[in-house]
């Protein structure tokens, strides 16, 4: 029972770190990366469809994304979706290929992105701490039902705390890498 609780907590903490990494991929740095457009979608046959399902997105160079639309009619919709997003990008269309040059980030924009990234990291830490709280609550319930001893309770809480510390350190490492990436000129 204790091992199941620890394993569940560890898996959920790892998922929280992965979710943070995925969220940070969508935040624009100075470099072109296809995941930058992963949050955008277009109206396609009456349904909202992610851009990466109706087009091929590649990084042409470090400052340009190239989007090859599968259906020529969608080129205008994809271009409009990119312009309407809060990414501050101006796509240029040439038939079925849309080029999206990424302007260099201003110092002010970099600092605001760092604040956003720190907020995301803090949300990740809070999620990990909530997982720890849930796991410790489950352990306390076992102790209350006399299914485990107080020694087992204390030892398990210490082990869960170690898992929490590892997850928070991973979040801090991911944050440091992203901040460094954002502040590079």
From Swiss-Prot:
Superkingdom, natural source: Bacteria
Subcellular localization, as worded in the UniProt entry: Cytoplasm
UniProt GO molecular function: ribosomal large subunit binding
GO BP annotation list: cytoplasmic translational termination
GO annotations of cellular component type: cytosol
Pfam family, one: RRF
Name of this protein: Ribosome-recycling factor
Record gene name: frr
